[in-house]
């Protein structure tokens, strides 16, 4: 693979924000903006997942150098639906909004709407062209993905002592004034990852424990004062190959019809190969199995094979197709959609 193509692909995959356009950098103050336009269409027999799914994401990252040891920073990111009527008030949502301080070699501390500690593991397989990352990770579901009220401490290279050993400690304040499936009580989470001093192989683990709300315990399904989850993952990223997998379990946390699953067992895997002419085929699998669900017993909540590909024209423009081959039974007790979905589209990002 030639070096210029490799640099483009690595930067795209690592994070959308790495394309940020620097709008200000002077006297220790820096401001970058980033975003993407995803023009996308779903094809499915499931009506709510058939049709235009286009959206725009936009954000900024800023930092200020307070002194040679201390830096302040903030980040905001929002998404705007491109398939809604202009009069629809639901067309915009805030994905990230946090600010914090970073002390050299000690770590960073921030507060706001951020990514939960469990997602530090789950993110390794959330690499499909469109789908994926939805077995145990769900937005505003305790600390499994993006969530509100998160106080987060992150330390890289373990205080400068161990290269590649990263640590996260996180606290989440209660959020009760919302839909019951998006509520949470006070909770704590942690994650750790290690790449063996910069090797191509890495391992990770995470654990979260939260109080559940009174309203959650009144639901027909899923009882218990605590919501708990753990996850462990491995990945390999070298020689144009990306392979990652993780296993996780949740207790009284994952939403189902009528409440929550008392237990879930979750597995995800992805393998991708980067060709030097810009094509990146992808093969993945996602499974979430609910256990001990009242009136149901055991039931697959998510189960699909994912086949897709991305073609990078350059660092800013790409085309993709992603086929979600649903493996759920059509007569599943919880009434979960079992239809396949094909996503196709173009992405421009900066």
From Swiss-Prot:
Pfam families given in the database record: Porin_1
SUPFAM superfamilies the UniProt entry points to: Porins (SSF56935)
Record's bilayer topology term: Multi-pass membrane protein
The keyword Membrane is annotated on this UniProt entry: yes
Primary gene name: phoE
Protein name: Outer membrane porin PhoE
Membership in a protein family: Belongs to the Gram-negative porin family.
Subunit (UniProt): Homotrimer.
GO BP terms, alphabetized: monoatomic ion transmembrane transport
Source domain of life: Bacteria
UniProt-annotated location(s): Cell outer membrane
Alphabetical UniProt keywords: Cell outer membrane, Ion transport, Membrane, Porin, Signal, Stress response, Transmembrane, Transmembrane beta strand, Transport
